[in-house]
């Protein structure tokens, strides 16, 4: 695994996850341009990783294929690690993912992360259209093992895919008599004991998505550590927690932006389209008592406030979990506020300006 050092004065490494949020009044083209700018800002401010997520058929999320956005970012950045957080593997064939991330590793050697999740990243109908009847959720561990074997080109003798090779990759280099290339750094993503135990058994780094729920985080991380088996790529457990954050000089503006994200989640939970409303539209909505409870839950989950207030919460999270890395999930309708969030957190922890 690529070495990871704490960021600035923080006792953990800091990274960024972008969901390609595209709000009301915004185009996907504008979103992609702003993602490039945000990745470059994250690199300049010393963040360790910049990941993109996978979502389908959602008005508020533009990256149905994080690997395509990552391909663009390889040419727009120089040092920061780039990755998918993640590829929802049941939506894909492992060989194709191995090929695509082999290409990314070729474009940015030593900088590519491949986070693997099993959620659909969409609604049931769209998931069915993507998977065409394949019950891939039930075979996620087998899919992961198959993908890892394609990446390393190490299927055992007698395996039906022993003669199938992901290109670019180790087999191509051997055939062409050149140095063996590196492979993407594979992570297991999740928010449950299932994913934690799988990551530990495979000897892979584990990323817990706190933005989806926090009830089992300590249990999941402890299960991962207890289940961990050293592998060729990782000798000891390594953990990352992603968390939704909005920081601003004005705490009330941070809350307004967090409210738009909470409203988007409310809409999805009540079977409305996952739209990211403007702060004005979001604040003008009159929720029912039950809806207000849902909004309050997400407003607690999406950490918002001044840079110091958000950083205090991150410190408490680290103290409670002992996590090695914390990944800031960008939130809100305003890309300017998302950029300000990264600046304020970087300033608080004294991250270098590169």
Task: Please place each PLM-identified region on the residue numbering.
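N-terminal beta1-alpha1-beta2 module of alpha/beta enzyme domains
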Residues: 1-80
């Amino acid at each position: 695994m690529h070495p990871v050092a704490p960021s600035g004065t923080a006792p953990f490494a800091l990274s960024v996850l972008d969901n390609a949020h595209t709000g009301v009044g915004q185009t996907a083209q504008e979103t992609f341009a702003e993602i490039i700018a945000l990745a470059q800002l994250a690199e300049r401010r010393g963040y360790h990783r910049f990941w993109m997520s996978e979502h389908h058929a959602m008005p508020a999320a533009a990256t149905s294929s994080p690997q395509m956005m990552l391909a663009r970012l390889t040419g727009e950045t120089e040092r920061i690690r780039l990755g998918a957080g993640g590829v929802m593997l049941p939506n894909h064939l492992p060989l194709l993912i191995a090929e695509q991330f082999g290409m990314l590793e070729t474009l940015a050697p030593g900088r590519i992360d491949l986070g693997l999740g099993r959620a659909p990243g969409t609604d049931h109908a769209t998931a069915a259209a993507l998977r065409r009847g394949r019950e891939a959720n039930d075979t996620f561990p087998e899919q992961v093992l198959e993908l890892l074997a394609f990446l390393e080109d190490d299927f055992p003798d007698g395996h039906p895919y022993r003669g199938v090779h992901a290109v670019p990759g180790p087999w191509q280099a051997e055939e062409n008599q050149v140095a063996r290339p590196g492979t993407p750094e594979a992570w297991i993503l999740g928010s449950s004991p299932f994913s934690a135990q799988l990551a530990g058994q495979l000897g892979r780094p584990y990323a817990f998505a706190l933005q989806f729920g926090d009830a089992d985080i300590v249990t999941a991380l402890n299960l991962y550590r207890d289940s961990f088996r050293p592998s060729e790529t990782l000798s000891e457990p390594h953990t990352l927690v992603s968390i939704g954050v909005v920081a601003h000089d004005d705490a009330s503006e941070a809350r307004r932006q967090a409210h738009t994200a909470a409203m988007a989640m409310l809409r999805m939970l009540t079977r409305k389209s996952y739209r990211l409303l403007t702060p004005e539209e979001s604040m003008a909505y009159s929720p029912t008592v039950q809806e207000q409870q849902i909004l309050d839950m997400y407003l607690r989950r999406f950490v918002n406030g001044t840079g110091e207030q958000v950083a205090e919460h991150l410190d408490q999270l680290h103290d409670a979990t002992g996590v090695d890395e914390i990944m800031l999930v960008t939130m809100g309708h305003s890309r300017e506020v998302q950029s300000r969030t990264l600046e304020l957190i970087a300033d608080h922890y004294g991250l270098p300006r590169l």
